[in-house]
A protein has these predicted regions:
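N-terminal start-of-chain detector that recognizes signal peptides
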Residues: 59-70, 177-181, 252-256, 293-300, ...
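Juxtamembrane extramembrane loops of integral membrane proteins
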Residues: 9-125, 181, 585-587
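Intrinsic low-complexity, intrinsically disordered segments enriched in polar/basic residues
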Residues: 43-49, 54-57, 61-64, 68-72, ...
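Helix-loop-helix
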Residues: 1-33, 38-39, 96, 208-209, ...
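Soluble non-transmembrane domains of integral membrane proteins
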Residues: 79-346
Length: 587
């Protein structure tokens, strides 16, 4: 895994970035050359210095991709003249460009990876490729994408265009401040795109305004996300495996992971979103409205996009429409507070386990307000769950010990009735009844606890609060394996990391199996039981070796408490046996 990560970070990603940049630059040049050819052939007559906007028939309408010529032309982006504007708030820095008035960078001020601010958007400044909140104007038989249109950028209240590299600072003293992008076509048609920022929220309002007279064909506005998000974690392959695209339509939620798909939907549009393990970007309709949506993906390169088509409502000759952008962490409480159902994207397990997972997450966060160390909080949760299931596990351990005590008598029955299975079954059940032993008593309580463990697994593995949360010493990130040292060679199944908690957990499981004892019986059964006692701790150590250290810490504490409980039960049973023996002697 470490070698794959090194290859991704040091060789593959930089190389692919160069290839992608070259491809985008080539496409941009081809666009400009195409516009020049159209002007020289007279298709753009009367629009000197202005590129003819290319209207494409929507693929989801006709599938033909035919091209027609617009009545009015808009300036086409020239790569050398693209201006990049940065908006800085206490929560994030976002960059927008005059190429389509799109958002091309979003860095979160409160989250870092290897010392650098987390960057969510996998997009550069090349025009015509779409980005976050890219817009296309849709008609019955044509589409006008704005990605290649050259806008001018203005700060709120200013009539002077912003220059390349301008920084607009928005703090608590300037809530609701905005950034505006304007363009005028050859026939006077105007389009304005705007962004409004709240310095205390990860939500950005993005809107568009234009006169319906200049663009009479427009029936709806398409808002797009994609072609993916930038990996934010050190372990790039694992982070890419968590890439998802999702959609809420009415009361239905649609989620797709990496793969080949192209699905279209119609209904009441709420939102569409892209997400990695800990962060998400979502397009939300301010008010749910009837429209269409599309989700696309390619397995080969992880390409994923989402788009929503919302109707263009005209008022007094003007069309205005907006969406809300959420660009930030997958924080359950923050997403739930939006009232859009985006908290459904938090990985909390199946719909049957989500209520339990939500309760566990709530407990985790509340305890952390009192104890500012998530490692100690996890230990307390482990102790609490052990107390909660104490009687169940007590019955389980006691039942297993009782079964061990019955093994000699059960073996005698097998020898006595080895040729009569029906009689053997009857006598076995009779023995269980006389001894007051339930053959399922050892495993049933453990089965009942499994949903809780699965719930804790989901919460501890996916919650943003544990990202880079330290415990103590070398354990500086409970969302990652605890790495004490790195070996010069990679070991099979384990990699080159030296992790302590999984080894301690495996050792604890071995001690627990020794204390629990093995099943008495013939030599072959005893040998198998002993082999199983040694194998299970090894299997669990390998299984948990690359798990988040917060989850391993929970299981380690649970194992230590189980050792104490088993020891206590054994001591009680031995004392009872001695008392029975002494009573038998005196009587």
């Amino acid at each position: 895994m470490a070698l794959i990560l090194a290859y991704q970070v040091l060789y593959y990603m930089p190389r692919m970035k160069k290839v992608d940049e070259a491809r985008r630059a080539r496409m941009a040049v081809e666009q400009v050359e195409k516009a020049a050819v159209e002007r020289s052939t007279g298709e753009g007559a009367g629009t000197a210095g202005v590129g003819v906007d290319t209207l494409r028939t929507p693929a989801d309408t006709t599938g033909a991709g035919s091209v027609t010529t617009a009545v009015a032309g808009f300036p086409i982006v020239e790569p050398a003249k693209i201006r990049r504007i940065t908006v800085r708030t206490p929560l994030y820095d976002v960059a927008l460009t005059t190429a389509g008035a799109e958002l091309v960078s979003a860095r979160l001020a409160r989250y870092r990876t290897q010392g650098e601010l987390v960057e969510l958007i996998a997009q550069d400044d090349s025009p015509g490729l779409g980005g976050i909140a890219d817009v296309s104007l849709l008609g019955d038989d044509r589409t006008l994408p704005l990605s290649s249109v050259a806008f001018d950028a203005f700060a709120e209240g200013s009539s002077a265009p912003l220059e390349d590299g301008a920084v607009v600072v928005i703090d608590k003293g300037t809530p609701g401040a905005g950034l505006f992008f304007r363009v005028t076509g050859a026939d006077g048609a105007e389009i304005e795109r705007y962004y409004t920022f709240d310095p205390e929220s990860y939500v950005i309002r993005s809107g568009i305004r234009f006169g319906s007279g200049g663009l009479p064909f427009v029936r709806s506005v398409r808002w797009g996300l994609g072609p993916g998000l930038r990996p934010t974690e050190v372990n790039v392959p694992v982070d890419l495996a968590q890439l998802r695209v999702s959609l809420r339509l009415g009361d239905e939620y649609h989620r797709k992971k990496r793969g080949d798909f192209d699905e279209r939907f119609s209904g009441t549009v709420h939102w569409a979103a892209l997400q990695m393990k800990y962060f998400t970007v979502a397009l939300m309709a301010p008010t749910p409205v009837g429209g269409e949506a599309r989700l696309e993906g390619r397995k080969t390169d992880g390409f994923m996009t989402a788009s929503i088509d919302l109707p263009a409502a005209e008022r007094q000759g003007r069309v205005e429409q907006s969406v809300d952008l959420y660009i930030g962490p997958i924080d359950f409480d923050a997403l739930k507070a939006l009232g859009k159902g985006l908290e459904k994207n938090v990985e909390l397990g199946s719909k049957y386990l989500r209520p339990v997972s939500a309760a566990v997450l709530w407990s985790l966060l509340k305890l952390h307000t009192i104890i500012p160390n998530y490692g100690i909080v996890i230990i307390l949760i482990s102790v609490f769950t052990k107390v909660l299931f104490y009687r169940l596990t007590h019955k389980s351990f006691k039942s297993m010990r009782d079964m061990q005590a019955l093994q000699p008598r059960l073996q005698a029955l097998k020898e006595k009735y080895k040729n009569d299975r029906q009689k053997l079954s009857q006598e076995t059940m009779k023995l269980y009844k006389e001894a007051g032993v339930n053959p399922l008593g050892g495993c049933l309580p453990m089965v009942l606890q499994m949903p809780v463990f699965i719930t804790l697994f989901n919460v501890l593995r996916n919650t943003i609060e544990l990202r880079q949360a330290p415990f103590f010493a070398w354990m500086n990130d409970l969302s990652q394996p605890d790495v004490l040292a790195t070996l010069p060679v990679s070991l099979p199944l384990l990699g080159n990391a030296v992790s302590v908690l999984p080894v301690l957990m495996g050792a604890g499981m071995l001690v627990q199996s020794r204390i629990g004892g093995s099943i008495a019986g013939p030599e072959s059964s005893a040998t198998q039981s002993k082999a199983l006692q040694h194998m299970l701790p090894i299997v669990f150590t390998v299984l948990f070796y690359k798990m988040p250290s917060g989850l391993v810490l929970y299981w380690l504490v649970n194992t230590v408490l189980s050792i104490w409980q088993q020891y206590y039960i054994n001591k009680g049973a031995e004392k009872a046996e001695r008392e029975r023996a002494e009573y038998a002697k005196t009587s």
